[in-house]
From Swiss-Prot:
GO terms for biological process: response to insect; response to wounding. Its main location: membrane. Brassicaceae-specific phytocytokine (plant endogenous peptide released into the apoplast) perceived by MIK2 in a BAK1/SERK3 and SERK4 coreceptors-dependent manner, that modulates various physiological and antimicrobial processes including growth prevention and reactive oxygen species (ROS) response regulation. This is Serine rich endogenous peptide 2. The lineage of its organism: Eukaryota, Viridiplantae, Streptophyta, Embryophyta, Tracheophyta. Belongs to the serine rich endogenous peptide (SCOOP) phytocytokine family. The gene is PROSCOOP2. Induction: Accumulates upon infection by generalist herbivores such as Spodoptera littoralis. It comes from Arabidopsis thaliana. It comes from the Eukaryota.
Length: 79
């Protein structure tokens, strides 16, 4: 079993090495590689909303505590 596994791995390595050196390999992708500027044009530009210059980058202050309601004198419970 280990012998067969070693042969399979060796065969895969040979195929990959020979494929990487030849340009018309059956395992190679049929598409031509695109120039780097072409795929960069397809990227969507994303603007960061948290840049150091924007005010949203500063740490947010915690909201002020709500004003406490006036204390009303507690009336004794009536039964």
């Amino acid at each position: 079993m280990a012998n067969n596994l070693g042969l399979v791995i060796l065969l895969l390595v040979i195929v990959l090495v020979s494929c990487s050196k030849s340009s018309d390999c059956a395992l190679a992708s049929p598409q031509k590689s695109r120039p780097s500027s072409e795929w960069r044009r397809k990227l969507i530009p994303v603007r960061s909303s948290r840049s150091p210059r924007s005010p949203s980058f500063a740490p947010k202050k915690p909201p002020p505590p709500p004003p406490s309601p006036p204390l009303s004198p507690s009336s004794p419970p009536s039964n």
